């Protein structure tokens, strides 16, 4: 099982590096913009958003959240709103700032999207897989120190994990990267064209994409395959809509 985790990590890393290399070669993206996109993701979602979660949700040491147990619908709405608010506002702030420095270019949207989505892939994809590798290795060797830290439900989940679920996790991260690129286009166009309905659309589209995983998190959507199918269909739909709206306008 652990070998499949390693393969998935290698594939994700290769996909990310390959995407950046291709974008740099074909579209001459600015690597500084890419780096700032990564910084914007880290500050908005890993610092500011998590700080709000701590203040509002009061997560316990074991990771449990009272709102998730008591009112899952409100928890979903809160999670969707916070993720969209922080990440899309980070895009807005960045492009407004960049616009004051110089004229915006099409490649800026691609560069920022790869930076923002790329670091998300690392944090939510590679980091999760590394943690899973460590825990799974400890369970297989019956490491007593780690076994004591695992709840019964978590232990059952790990022991029942299938190979295809590991690759499915990698597939979801690739879909998420694609969606981050599309969302960046919407905010970029909002700033460039001064049409703030595009910004509102970006907030809504972000929540739209996060809905299926949120439903799965609270147990209302139990099929991992169905979640990924929904995400893939959403990505195709939004990509088509984005191209139809902006292809001739950009």
Tell where the protein language model's regions lie, with residue ranges.
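Hydrophobic alpha-helical segments at protein termini of multi-pass membrane proteins
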Residues: 1-250
